[in-house]
C-alpha cells in the first residue's frame, strides 16, 4: 500500500495523490495544451493494471480527459472493488464533462460519489473558441446525467480576464440553480504561452471575489476539505464557492498533494520541473514496502514551493509542460 503518513522535507503531510490515466483529450483548451499537441506513444503510458498497483487510499483520477482512455470502465470497476473491500477510502474524478453522460451511471455504480467538471463559460460560441472545437451541450448533458445518477458535481472555472469576466455572475447563478458547488481557479503560467496572453488574461481571485461581492454577500465558512481552496458561502443562495489562488494567495506551505502522470512521473510540485520516474518499478511489478520506499524518497524531495509569478510586463516560473501532461 502507499505509505501513510507521508512527510516531505519541510514537515508537510502528503495525503493526496492525483493520478493521470492519459494525456489525451477530446478538447484543446488554450490554457491546457497546444492545438497541435503530440501525445505520448501508447507504450510509454502506464497500463491501468500498473496504476492499480499503487495501492492508494484516496484517489483522484485525472487526465487529459480520463474518460477517453480505453478500458477506463474496467479500471473504475477494479477501484470499486477496492472501495467495497476497504482498501480504498475515496474515488473521485476530474473531467471536462463531454463523455460524462455515457459514463455517469457506471461511475456511480463503481462507488464514485462526486466529480469535478471544468466549465469556464456558459456560452456555446465562447466555449467552442476556448476549447477550440468543443460542444457545450455535451457538458450540460454530462452534468445532468451525473446528478441523475446521484453524483455530486463541482464546477471548476478558470478566471480569465477579457474572456469570461463578463460571466462571473452568470456562472454563479447557473451553479446555484443546478445545485453545483463552484470553484474559481487562477491562471498559472504553464504550457504553451503566446506572447502576452497570460499577462492579459491573469485575473487575481481577490478581484473576482470583490466583483462577486458587488452583488452577493459572501461569508467565509472556514471549510477545510484538505485541498488548496478557500471557501465562502453565498448568503442569498446557500451555495458554496471556492477560490484556488496559487499566485495571489500562495498555499505552498500547506500543500499536501502530489501528481502521478500517465507516464509514471511523480511530480511533487506543479511549479517545478523536478520529478521521480516510478514507471520502471511499477513495470517491474514492485509492490508493498519496496514501492513505498521509492515513493517516500520521491516525496522527501518535494520543494518548498513553486516559482510562478506575474510581473507588470513579464511571466516568471513558466512550466513548459502542459497541464494535460501533468494531470489537471
UniProtKB/Swiss-Prot annotation:
Gene Ontology biological-process annotations: Mo-molybdopterin cofactor biosynthetic process
Cofactor names: [4Fe-4S] cluster
Residues that bind [4Fe-4S] cluster 1: 25, 29, 32
Pathways involved: Cofactor biosynthesis; molybdopterin biosynthesis
Reactions mediated catalytically: GTP + AH2 + S-adenosyl-L-methionine = (8S)-3',8-cyclo-7,8-dihydroguanosine 5'-triphosphate + 5'-deoxyadenosine + L-methionine + A + H(+)
EC number(s) per entry: 4.1.99.22
InterPro entries (alphabetical): Aldolase_TIM, Elp3/MiaA/NifB-like_rSAM, MoaA, MoaA_NifB_PqqE_Fe-S-bd_CS, MoaA_twitch, MoCo_biosynth_MoaA/MoaC, rSAM
Keywords for this protein: 4Fe-4S, GTP-binding, Iron, Iron-sulfur, Lyase, Metal-binding, Molybdenum cofactor biosynthesis, Nucleotide-binding, S-adenosyl-L-methionine
Binding annotation for S-adenosyl-L-methionine: 31, 64, 118, 188
Binding site for GTP: 18, 60, 94, 154, 257-259
Residues covered by the Radical SAM core domain: 9-229
One example GO MF annotation: metal ion binding
Signal peptide stretch: none
Gene3D superfamilies per UniProt: Aldolase class I
UniProt binding sites for [4Fe-4S] cluster 2: 252, 255, 269
Cofactor binding note: Binds 2 [4Fe-4S] clusters. Binds 1 [4Fe-4S] cluster coordinated with 3 cysteines and an exchangeable S-adenosyl-L-methionine and 1 [4Fe-4S] cluster coordinated with 3 cysteines and the GTP-derived substrate.
Quaternary structure (record): Monomer and homodimer.
Described function: Catalyzes the cyclization of GTP to (8S)-3',8-cyclo-7,8-dihydroguanosine 5'-triphosphate.
Family label: Belongs to the radical SAM superfamily. MoaA family.
Note: Seems to be specifically required for the biogenesis of DMSO reductase. PubMed:10411269 shows that MoaA contains a 3Fe-4S cluster, but it may actually be two 4Fe-4S clusters as was shown in the crystallographic study of the protein homolog from Staphylococcus aureus.
Protein name per UniProt: GTP 3',8-cyclase
Gene source species: Rhodobacter capsulatus
Originating gene: moaA
Amino acid at each position: 500500500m502507499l505509505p501513510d503518513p507521508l512527510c516531505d522535507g519541510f514537515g508537510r503531510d502528503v495525503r493526496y495523490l492525483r493520478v493521470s490515466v492519459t494525456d489525451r483529450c477530446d478538447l484543446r483548451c488554450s490554457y491546457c495544451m497546444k492545438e497541435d499537441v503530440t501525445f505520448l506513444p501508447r507504450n510509454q503510458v502506464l497500463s491501468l493494471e500498473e496504476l492499480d498497483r499503487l495501492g492508494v487510499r484516496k484517489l483522484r483520477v485525472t487526465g487529459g480527459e480520463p474518460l477517453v482512455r480505453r478500458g477506463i470502465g474496467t479500471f473504475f470497476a477494479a477501484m470499486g472493488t477496492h472501495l467495497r473491500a476497504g482498501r480504498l477510502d475515496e474515488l473521485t474524478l476530474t473531467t471536462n464533462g463531454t463523455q460524462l453522460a455515457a459514463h455517469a451511471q457506471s461511475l456511480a455504480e463503481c462507488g464514485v460519489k462526486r466529480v469535478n467538471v471544468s466549465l469556464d463559460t456558459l456560452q456555446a460560441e465562447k466555449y467552442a473558441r476556448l476549447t477550440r472545437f468543443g460542444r457545450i451541450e455535451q457538458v450540460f448533458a454530462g452534468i445532468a446525467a451525473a446528478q441523475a445518477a446521484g453524483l455530486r458535481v463541482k464546477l471548476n472555472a478558470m478566471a480569465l480576464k477579457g474572456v469570461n469576466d463578463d460571466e462571473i455572475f452568470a456562472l454563479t447563478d447557473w451553479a446555484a440553480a443546478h445545485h453545483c458547488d463552484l470553484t474559481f481557479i487562477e491562471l498559472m503560467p504553464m504550457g504553451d504561452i503566446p506572447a502576452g496572453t497570460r499577462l492579459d488574461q491573469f485575473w487575481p481571485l481577490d478581484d473576482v471575489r470583490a466583483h462577486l461581492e458587488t452583488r452577493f454577500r459572501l461569508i467565509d465558512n472556514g471549510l477545510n476539505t484538505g485541498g488548496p481552496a478557500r471557501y465562502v458561502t453565498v448568503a442569498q443562495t446557500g451555495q458554496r464557492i471556492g477560490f484556488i489562488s496559487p499566485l495571489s494567495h500562495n498555499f505552498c506551505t500547506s500543500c499536501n498533494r502530489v501528481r502521478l502522470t500517465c507516464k509514471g512521473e511523480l511530480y511533487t510540485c506543479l511549479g517545478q520541473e523536478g520529478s521521480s520516474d516510478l514507471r520502471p518499478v511499477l513495470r517491474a511489478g514492485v509492490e508493498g514496502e519496496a514501492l513505498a520506499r521509492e515513493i517516500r524518497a520521491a516525496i522527501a524531495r518535494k520543494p518548498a514551493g513553486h516559482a510562478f509569478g506575474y510581473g507588470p510586463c513579464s511571466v516568471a516560473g513558466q512550466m513548459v509542460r502542459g497541464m494535460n501532461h501533468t494531470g489537471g
